[in-house]
């Protein structure tokens, strides 16, 4: 990957795509708000390639990579690493991290937004999306870069950690670079964006592949990916910054009680079966 990215960085510098696409793609390019203490802020492909020994780093200014796919606008964001631990053994960190913000158009007007979050996504009517200068605002969770419509704390299923998207970190309006299935050259790279490889430990993750090879049809079927997203249900948070903590915590307690009941009921039936003589036995 290092050699390929090095070549792509040089070639991209010589045959660079337009830095911004006039019109609707540029108009809706998102404003990105990091969480406080974010160790790996939004970057660019050239800056990421610069992490490889012997390759000059590109501009430090963050970039979003935009494309129009039929009635959808896609904005891809690259981060040098995902640094949020997961699971009981606290694994899950990996080099390289791609995230996606997607907008549904009706004519030239955005009507729906879909933000990627871990292995899924959240969908919301565009009129409910917070905006800055007419652009959608994206709040990133610390370490994981899961994208949210409002800042706050999200309670995730134990043992995974909560998502902290407090909106108090770096706020940027990234430069927009247009991409397609063939340009710039790095879009054709079929390897992994990073050296991390998952081992046998549960929760370990390999570095991701690029936008065109993302799972769940992100690139090839934007509408299908959006249809699978969960609808946004709460766009406000309490004074402590908790956006869904109470509901999720209650669901976790109910699930634990249900599991305990199932175990006790199963043990009771087993004892009854052991105490009952077999048919025909005298």
Over which residues does each language-model region extend?
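Membrane-interface motif at the C-terminal end of an N-terminal transmembrane signal
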Residues: 18-20, 264-271
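Selective detector of the "anchor" transmembrane alpha-helix that sits immediately C-terminal
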Residues: 247-268
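Bacterial N-terminal signal peptides
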Residues: 6-16
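Positively charged n-region of N-terminal signal peptides that target proteins for export
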Residues: 1-4
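Cytoplasmic C-terminal tails of single-pass
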Residues: 272-282
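A domain-level signal for the mature, folded cores of soluble proteins
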Residues: 20-99, 105, 109-250
């Amino acid at each position: 990957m290092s050699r390929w990215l090095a070549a792509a960085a040089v070639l991209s510098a010589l045959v660079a795509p337009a830095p911004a696409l006039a019109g609707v793609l540029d108009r809706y390019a998102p404003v990105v708000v990091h969480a406080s203490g974010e160790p790996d802020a939004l970057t660019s492909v050239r800056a990421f390639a610069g992490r490889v020994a012997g390759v000059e780093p590109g501009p430090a200014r963050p970039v979003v990579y935009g494309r129009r796919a039929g009635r959808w606008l896609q904005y891809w964001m690259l981060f040098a690493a995902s640094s949020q631990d997961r699971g009981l053994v606290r694994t899950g960190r990996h080099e390289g991290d791609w995230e996606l913000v997607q907008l549904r158009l009706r004519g030239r007007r955005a009507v729906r937004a879909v933000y990627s979050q871990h292995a899924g996504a959240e969908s919301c009517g565009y009129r409910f999306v917070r905006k800055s200068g007419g652009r959608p605002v994206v709040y990133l969770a610390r370490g994981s870069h899961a994208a949210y419509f409002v800042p706050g704390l999200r309670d995730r299923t134990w043992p995974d950690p909560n998502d902290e998207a407090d909106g108090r970190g770096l706020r940027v309006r990234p430069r927009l670079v247009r991409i397609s299935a063939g340009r710039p050259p790095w879009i054709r790279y079929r390897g992994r964006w990073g050296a991390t490889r998952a081992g046998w430990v549960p929760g370990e993750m390999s570095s991701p592949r690029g936008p065109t090879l993302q799972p769940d049809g992100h690139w090839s079927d934007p509408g299908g990916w959006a249809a699978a997203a969960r609808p946004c249900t709460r766009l406000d948070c309490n004074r402590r910054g908790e956006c869904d903590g109470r509901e999720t915590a209650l669901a976790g307690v109910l699930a634990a009680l249900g599991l305990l009941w199932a175990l006790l009921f199963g043990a009771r039936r087993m004892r009854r079966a052991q105490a009952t003589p077999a048919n025909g036995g005298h």
